[in-house]
Regions:
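Sec-dependent signal peptide recognition
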Residues: 2-8
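A periodicity- and composition-biased signal for non-globular, repetitive helical segments
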Residues: 8-10, 112
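C-terminal motif of bacterial Sec signal peptides marking the signal peptidase cleavage site
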Residues: 13-16
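Catalytic glycan-binding domains that act on GlcNAc-containing polysaccharides
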Residues: 18-164
Length: 164
């Protein structure tokens, strides 16, 4: 009897993992996403209060960068078109943050245990990065287009006009 209970509880636990990591089916409707993901709603609202970055901007960045996939990675590079040689970059997670930028965020924000696969941490990262962009490059936090260009290209890439 005890083994049956353990097996059943293990099965329920494993199945529930899939429920919590499932990609939202209606990715083009922010209200639907947040209605079905209360923890995501709390995260984007907290980031809005902390960094002054709108939930709409956060969700737009995450949708564009990872399609709401926690473990999103960049495509592989291939040698001679067939032998995989690594990834295009170290971008990973919801926010597709690069290793160096993520390390900078963890050190600067004090969030040393942050994980790129955690939605709340990714939301906070985006808020922090937009705040950094506002301070360093003077792009308004409400200028979603220019903020995204700076996010995607990096501060140096944006300043050099690499996006043009």
């Amino acid at each position: 009897m005890k083994i049956k209970i353990i097996v059943i509880l293990s099965f329920v636990f494993i199945q529930s993992c899939g429920v919590f990591n499932r990609i939202p089916s209606s990715q083009n409707n922010a209200c639907d996403i947040l209605d079905h993901r209360s923890s995501w709603k709390r995260a984007v609202n907290y980031t809005n209060k902390k960094w002054g970055v709108s939930p709409a901007l956060q969700l737009a960045f995450i949708k564009t960068e990872s399609n709401f996939r926690a473990r999103a990675k960049t495509p592989r590079k291939f040698f001679l078109g067939i032998l995989p040689t690594g990834r295009i970059s170290s971008a990973y997670g919801y926010a597709q943050a690069l290793d160096g930028t993520w390390d900078w965020y963890k050190k600067d924000s004090g969030n040393r245990n942050a994980s790129r696969t955690d939605f709340s941490d990714s939301s906070d990262f985006i808020g922090w990065y937009v705040d950094q962009t506002n301070k360093k490059i003077k792009i308004s936090k409400s200028d979603v287009y220019r903020q995204y260009l700076a996010y995607h290209q990096g501060h140096a890439g944006y300043k050099s006009g690499r996006y043009k």
